[in-house]
Swiss-Prot record:
Its EC number is 2.7.1.33. This is Type III pantothenate kinase. GO terms for molecular function: ATP binding; pantothenate kinase activity. It catalyses: (R)-pantothenate + ATP = (R)-4'-phosphopantothenate + ADP + H(+). Gene3D superfamilies: 3.30.420.40. Substrate binds at Y96, G103, A104, D105, R106, T183. The keyword ATP-binding applies. One of its GO terms (cellular component) is cytoplasm. One of its GO terms (biological process) is coenzyme A biosynthetic process. ATP binds at D7, V8, G9, N10, T11, R12, L13, K14, T133. Homodimer. Keywords: ATP-binding, Coenzyme A biosynthesis, Cytoplasm, Kinase, Nucleotide-binding, Potassium, Transferase. Its cofactor is NH4(+); K(+).
Length: 255
């Protein structure tokens, strides 16, 4: 029984094929494609894969992209299943006002982070940070309840917004400096410290709410860029979305 996990973000599709849907399942193959190139998957990277028996995916790119992905999956006899956030799954309780409106990527990442944290120690409050096109900073208490979270623009969106709305700011990407002395560094540093400040704020809110020190887990394509600028302790975790999909699939696909 093979399992295909798919993570479709705003710019890229990432996929991973496992021997079976379980946290510790061996990885058979993996890859990534920009969304412009996903129509080549069936004749390219997926053509020689062992056919998956189950698939679970997370998508934020919209229905048109979802249909393109499903068209590529027609080379296999497998039913596409896409995550929609629910009131609770895999040990987490969803505290969103309307649970189904929570982004699937946030929900899956929180499930992955919760089980990752729980596997390395006792349950404790958790802040989950995803750094990508957008940045999300989500809080979970020690019982596994998602309390709420923040959404803010990622580095690229911040810079493009300033460039489009302010004359004279079409400048190269700069470096993060404590005291920037040129416009490029000022823009890059401002965006970086804005994200770091949001994380610090949520850690403090969760600390005050729960009365204990939270653990912070960071993931996402640009997470490593934030590492030098963070003032709170955190763990950088790769493939948090895949971790969450594996946890969910292990409970959904029980043969």
């Amino acid at each position: 029984m093979t399992f295909l996990a798919i993570d479709v973000g705003n710019t890229r599709l990432k996929w991973a094929l496992y021997t079976h849907p379980h946290r510790d399942a061996p990885l058979l193959a993996q890859g990534a494609e920009f969304l412009d190139n996903i129509d080549k998957l069936a004749d390219g990277a997926w053509a020689t894969l062992t056919p998956p028996t189950h698939m679970l995916g997370c998508i934020v790119a919209g229905d048109a992209v979802r249909r393109r992905v499903e068209a590529q999956m027609e080379l296999w006899d497998v039913a596409p299943q896409w995550v929609v956030a629910s009131a609770g799954e895999a040990g987490l309780t969803n505290g969103y006002d309307y649970p189904a409106r929570l982004g699937a990527d946030r929900w899956v990442a929180m499930i992955g982070a919760w089980h990752h944290a729980f596997s390395t120690g006792p349950a404790r409050p958790l802040v989950v940070v995803m750094v990508g096109t957008a940045v999300t900073v989500d809080a979970i208490d020690a019982s596994g309840k998602f309390l709420g979270g923040l959404i803010l623009p990622g580095h690229g969106i911040m810079l493009r917004a300033l460039e489009s709305g302010t004359a004279g700011l079409h400048v190269p990407t700069g470096e993060v400096r404590e005291f920037p002395t040129n416009t490029s560094d000022a823009l890059t540093s401002g965006g970086t410290f804005a994200i770091a400040g949001a994380v610090n704020c949520m850690v403090q809110h969760l600390r005050d709410h729960c009365g204990t020190e939270p653990k912070c887990i960071m993931a996402g394509g640009a997470g490593w860029k934030m590492a030098p600028s963070m003032s709170v302790q955190f763990e950088l975790v790769d493939n948090l979305i895949f971790d969450g999909l594996l946890e969910m699939a292990a409970r959904r696909f029980i043969d």
